[in-house]
Amino acid sequence: ARGICLRARGTAGRLHACYKLAQNVMEYSSGIATRTAEMSAAARAVNPAVHVAVTRKHFPGAKALSLKAALAGGASLHRLGLSDSILAFDQHRIFADDFIALIPKMAAAFPEKKIEAEAESPEEAMGYLRAGIDMVQCERFAPAELAAFVKEAKAEFPRAVIAAAGGINAANAAEYAATGVDVLVTSWVYFGKPEDIKMKFSRA
């Protein structure tokens, strides 16, 4: 779209001191928002209920801008930090003798927190659901494998939240959304070409 998105007035010296920073911030943020919007549109075209959720894997120091840009593009936030939910990856579970047994204990200890775990197979994911986990994140499942798992899991646990993660982007978002998952988890939107925003000086 063409049009003015930002206008500033000031002395020549002050304008030159800040315009390039403003232009760069807007270009990078707009790139994130555009990629997010494209991915969300592709996913919701086949599954209107699906959410695109962005991770914390943004460029260090750019959290606020990255997350606001993703929100502007129509995404939700997977997590803001380590304290807003419990998410167990393999690098956490390796230190537990019996992670399955920990799930009900975590639920009892933190009743206000959602408990989520990453799974690398349908069998592992189903085991977590049967132990009472709130959300399972299916890591790099093939679409056909994921669709079969979603059907089985929702039949037994209709309130469970199922997320797909690992390599999901605008090109394959529709295919993964069509499996019936609730959430597509991605960091793809952060990495790509900035938008091209032109700037022009004029004298008052």
Question: Language-model segments: which ranges?
Answer:
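Short secondary-structure boundary segments
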Residues: 140, 166, 187-188
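Catalytic-pocket segment enriched in acidic/His residues
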Residues: 142, 153-154, 169, 175-177
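Acidic/glycine-rich phosphate/pyrophosphate-binding loops and surrounding catalytic core
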Residues: 1-120, 124-131, 135, 147, ...
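Structured adenosyl-cofactor binding patch, chiefly the S-adenosyl-L-methionine
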Residues: 195-203
